[in-house]
């Protein structure tokens, strides 16, 4: 749904419409969809008004005023800023309470903070997901072969840790945070959940309940 290259012909996709219909049927907690394309936004608003919508970080809005304009849009319940805005506290503090309530920070981005090809990277992923070839983009990161590493993400200038949330963001009035990595392996996702959602003194207990036992032999 956050594909940046959608065309009108893609709006009739059977699987995506079935998924939206399923989300819309839920009478309990309201479901939402992360969106890049305004074309898709208009289609979903018309056909699935039960859903709420989130402005995707794949828009790569690197101008703060542009980001603020996105936050002010009534179309979105939440807006995920480019992770390079995460620590620009002087600018973030200028937002009103209602605007702060709409900001959803991406906490654990691993991409280079200085990357200038982020938008092209997302477009390449969009082309691949549409089955197109020859995207013309190749990541030039020095540590590309390592893949995603949480330890590396923690060193990123835009990283938001638990202490940051508790001691900086919450006092400023920000309460929405998201974790990257749904497409990564379950072991990494477990580490995210342990770090962000489990008190340190209970993390080992959770690991033991899930997979650690005296028969596990890794080496």
Language model: regions and residue ranges:
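Active-site pocket-lining/capping segments in soluble small-molecule metabolic enzymes
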Residues: 1-66, 70, 76-219
